[in-house]
Amino acid sequence: MPPKPTNWRMYGKMAVAGLTCCVGGPALIYYISPTEEELFLKYNPELQKRSLENRVGKQEDFDNFVARLKEYSKSDRPIWVEAEEAARKKRSGKIEEQAKLMQEMQQRKEEIKKSGTNLMPGGSL
């Protein structure tokens, strides 16, 4: 029995369909997706004003975030480990700061007690 002939018509249809899906799909999405400017113009005036006011702050936050990511990526360890360690250091720094404030408050109370000033809660000066 001779081998079956190659069905070039079927392979051609499959190639055209695959090319249409692979190229046409993203092209269609690119064509129908609105730009940031078009979305901004669809906002009501109050939202446009608020968005313009918050734009600088959001940009600064994003820049800080990217700077931190660059700093974390300098290490050999994964970024999430570095971020967790930085958060832990920040928390411990806040705890130490709170402890210092409490100690200063205690010292002030002791100074007031030693000076002999009698403070009454709710009293007038």
From Swiss-Prot:
Q: Where in the cell is it found?
A: Mitochondrion inner membrane
UniProt keyword Acyltransferase present: no
Q: Which residues form a coiled coil?
A: 92-119
Q: Name one GO biological process term.
A: mitochondrial respiratory chain complex III assembly
Ranges for region Disordered:
103-125
Arranged from A to Z, the UniProt key words for this protein are:
Chaperone, Coiled coil, Membrane, Mitochondrion, Mitochondrion inner membrane, Transmembrane, Transmembrane helix
| UniProt name for this protein | Assembly factor cbp4
Species source reads Botryotinia fuckeliana (strain B05.10)
Recorded name of the encoding gene: cbp4
